[in-house]
From Swiss-Prot:
HAMAP family: S_AdoMet_synth1 (MF_00086)
Main subcellular localisation: cytoplasm
Molecular-function annotations in GO: ATP binding; magnesium ion binding; methionine adenosyltransferase activity
Gene: metK
Protein name (database record): S-adenosylmethionine synthase
Sequence segments annotated as region (Flexible loop): 95-105
Length: 414
């Protein structure tokens, strides 16, 4: 069995991620060359913005915060956190010139530049992972895919009034049963959702929880699984608000920080993680852009039918354009050797930061999408949301990889 969790947009850490990425969107929309490292802290009645920004853009950060908090659903001060009454403290510095010089002019541009993609160095050292598998149509692990579906539906029934007693904070967790490496059933579903103390005339705590449990099954679980081949059954354990109630939530219940939900943001623990968060960072930061590129590589390999599972690791040195290492691992599911896949990747994917920026248009996307792009992926996962038309989710190289792998496997092996 394997478990993964997701959270709704009203979770304190996710509030921070969305504000951080709304800042990235606003700055890149006005100045695509902005350098951003925006960190956010939320607590009862307070939002703190800090980090480093170098940009020609002028942004009203206080208004941006209030608009995003209201959009998420915190509009009532009685809940301990409200868009219009919370304090907003802003404390940004500029990016360190020592870091900037390595990003602006990579080591290669000062020693052995071959083309324009050697100009930009990695914004930091680090290692990033990308992953894909064939458990779902979007080529994501099934546990995290289901957890995100439940969280998204939980937020939807709150916002559309189906369950008006719900409040913005919520979490989901799904445990999937596997046999011989393939998902075969749903072992446990867990939904914790913030709610009002009473529901209409229902005031007794146990009765409130009974109503919530029944409503969540009908309005959240059943719609999510309606058209899926694997469904909960009589053996599935269904848990809702196991503490007995969840009235106090959001920033009033827990402080939130940017970058504390990196497993929710990626593969639900199914794949390894390099440790770097995504939100609040402009795409010169390889924590973000290289993780997107690694997902793109892995997804195209699986989409090509060259493996059932694929994990890609890439690492960088600060101020250096070319990756330090590249690793392809298919866990015994590859149709050609991993060494052959590595050679294919080296031939067809350019993982220098400037090349990633150019291919995915990561600096231009906020402006192209009307001022909001990164904030949309700051909740419900940076991977697998195919409805958002994310460039790293495309499988436009799958046919090429398939053709070359099977036509020239011997040549690739050398």
């Amino acid at each position: 069995m394997f478990s993964s969790e997701s959270v709704t947009e009203g979770h304190p850490d996710k509030i921070c991620d969305q504000i951080s990425d709304a800042i990235v969107d606003a700055l890149l929309t006005a100045d695509p060359l902005s350098r951003v490292a925006a960190e956010v802290v939320v607590n009862t009645g307070m939002v703190i913005l800090t980090g480093e920004i170098t940009s020609q853009a002028h942004v009203n950060f206080t208004r941006l915060v209030r608009d995003k908090v209201a959009e998420i659903g915190y509009t009532d001060a009685k809940n301990g956190f409200s868009a219009e009454s919370c304090a907003v403290l802003v404390a940004f510095d500029e990016q360190s010139p020592d870091i900037a010089q390595g990003v602006n002019l990579a080591l290669e541009s000062r020693t052995s530049q071959e083309d324009e993609f050697d100009l930009i160095g990695a914004g930091d050292q680090g290692l990033m992972f990308g992953f894909a598998c064939d458990e779902t149509p979007e080529l994501m692990p099934l546990p995290i895919s289901l957890a995100h579906r439940l969280s998204r539906q939980l937020a939807a029934v709150r916002k559309n009034g189906t369950l008006p007693y719900l409040r913005p904070d919520g979490k989901t967790q799904v445990t999937v049963a596997y046999e011989e490496g393939r998902p075969v059933g749903i072992h446990t579903l867990l939904i914790s959702t913030q709610h009002t103390p009473t529901i209409g005339a229902i005031t007794e705590e146990a009765a409130v929880q009974e109503r919530i449990r029944a409503d969540l099954w009908e309005a959240v679980v059943q719609p999510v699984f309606a058209e899926l081949p694997i469904k909960p059954d009589g053996n599935t354990r269904f848990l809702t608000n196991p503490t007995g109630k969840f009235v106090i939530g959001g920033p009033q219940g827990d402080a939130g920080l940017t970058g504390r939900k990196i497993i929710v943001d990626t593969y639900g623990g199914y794949s390894r993680h390099g440790g770097g968060a995504f939100s609040g960072k402009d795409p010169t930061k390889v924590d973000r852009s290289a993780a997107y590129a690694a997902r793109y590589v892995a997804k195209n390999i699986v989409a090509a039918g060259l493996a059932q599972k694929c994990e890609v690791q890439v690492s960088y040195a600060i101020g250096v354009a070319r990756p330090i290492n590249l690793l392809v691992e298919t866990f015994g599911t590859g149709r050609i050797p991993d060494e052959a896949l590595l050679r294919l990747v080296q031939r067809h994917f350019d993982l220098r930061p400037a090349a990633i920026l150019a291919q995915f248009q990561l600096r231009e996307l906020p402006r192209q999408r009307g001022g909001r792009f990164y904030q949309n992926v700051a909740v419900y996962g940076h991977f697998g949301q195919t409805h958002l038309d994310l460039p790293w989710e495309r499988t436009d190289k799958a046919a090429l990889l398939r053709e070359e792998a099977f036509a020239g496997a011997t040549a690739i092996l050398g």
